[in-house]
Amino acid sequence: MANVIKTVLTYQLDGSNRDFNIPFEYLARKFVVVTLIGVDRKVLTINTDYRFATRTTISLTKAWGPADGYTTIELRRVTSTTDRLVDFTDGSILRAYDLNVAQIQTMHVAEEARDLTTDTIGVNNDGHLDARGRRIVNLANAVDDRDAVPFGQLKTMNQNSWQARNEALQFRNEAETFRNQAEGFKNESSTNATNTKQWRDETKGFRDEAKRFKNTAGQYATSAGNSASAAHQSEVNAENSATASANSAHLAEQQADRAEREADKLENYNGLAGAIDKVDGTNVYWKGNIHANGRLYMTTNGFDCGQYQQFFGGVTNRYSVMEWGDENGWLMYVQRREWTTAIGGNIQLVVNGQIITQGGAMTGQLKLQNGHVLQLESASDKAHYILSKDGNRNNWYIGRGSDNNNDCTFHSYVHGTTLTLKQDYAVVNKHFHVGQAVVATDGNIQGTKWGGKWLDAYLRDSFVAKSKAWTQVWSGSAGGGVSVTVSQDLRFRNIWIKCANNSWNFFRTGPDGIYFIASDGGWLRFQIHSNGLGFKNIADSRSVPNAIMVENE
């Protein structure tokens, strides 16, 4: 059978109701803890924030509600394990009442422990951990394969996977574009190859024709030689003609060689012309890449690549500059301000916009000039902070460490110390030092103002505790069998009963029940009933009660 929680009860706050019922028994009012739940857990103070209207009812001094940031109120019994209501000493008389109170206090502690166990994570019928339909908060990131994984770590993994998918789709689209461009270049290259082959064939024809001219000239030379032999008899007369023919043959041979060289040049030029896309005035547009085995010299100060531009040059106080830009303006530049070997501020990298990194590390110092700031920016529902690490170990962080609040936190992993700046106050989880003064987490204060003591010790040493007051809750006469009504709950209280013999008799009560006292030669047997508001004289001997007083709580 499932355990039913009996020592904790919550009520909804509506901004109008101030009275709430206490459904459980308790030994002392200080064991009842009243807490508002909403923006935080606010523990209320008795007689300041609430009071006991009756034994089973508390009344708030203010009607709390959602407008104040609180939606529910919790009534919880927390019986002290150190503040015992009954303390036994050697030689004392064991009374049933004392034994009952001691036993009830022990039972209450056990019952509260059982309820606390029932209200926390447990084990179901199959032996598995059961969070009972509630969240597990403040869970560290998983490390090993069988660790529990927090939702934030899953979201980060999903975001990284989605980003990788988008980048892969982008690369695929770019590859598709490059493939289409390559297909176009291939078609253009095929056309150029056909044209080049045609020009090569034409050039070869020109070269063959030049060779024919060369052969014809040789034939003319042979014919002239035969004529010279035949005209040997008239050699003197024909010498001038032979010399002229030889000169003509030599000139023809030179012209043929020149024609062959020009044909070779024309073939190379045809290949060069095939690589040119177009010529616009003095601007030449190439179809493919330009390869230079040596350095590439440019007489102007830069070059364009698609929509992007790169500039080189230098002016006064900017000895050398390498700048990247586009049609809308400059994007970034690297410059050496003066010709010197000094680095420092002499070498500058300037970006006209945001710098976005995808990981990695930066070495060296980051220096911000006067008037500049270091700004961390993230989505409104994301955490952002500065984290210091030593190797793989976290040292400290400053910032908003979670994504569900706007608090600024200074946290030291090494010392476990945290300072949190909230909307209108600051919270520290350890002692807070102001000069030589110390403020403890429980509200205690230590300092020279109190003689170097803690404030509670100083007050105990310097002042006498105020005595409790008494209140008369009934007066009259209650003979045997008579039952009367009192104005306050008599259960678990220090009471005084005045009997007919004018003697006051002290008694410590428990729950509703029957009690017995001896009174100055007589005795009284009485009953407390009706949730502590009824008093009945069962029987007496010369001890008729005529007044009852209770010690104020």
UniProtKB/Swiss-Prot annotation:
Biased composition annotated in UniProt, kind: Polar residues: 187-197
Primary localization: virion
GO terms (molecular function) for this protein are: identical protein binding
The highest taxon in the source lineage is Viruses
Q: Which family does it belong to?
A: Belongs to the Teseptimavirus fiber family.
**What the protein does?**
Structural component of the short non-contractile tail. The tail comprises six fibers made of gp17 trimers, 2 nm in diameter and 32 nm in length. May attach to host lipopolysaccharides (LPS) to mediate primary attachment to the host cell.
Q: What's the protein name? A: Tail fiber protein
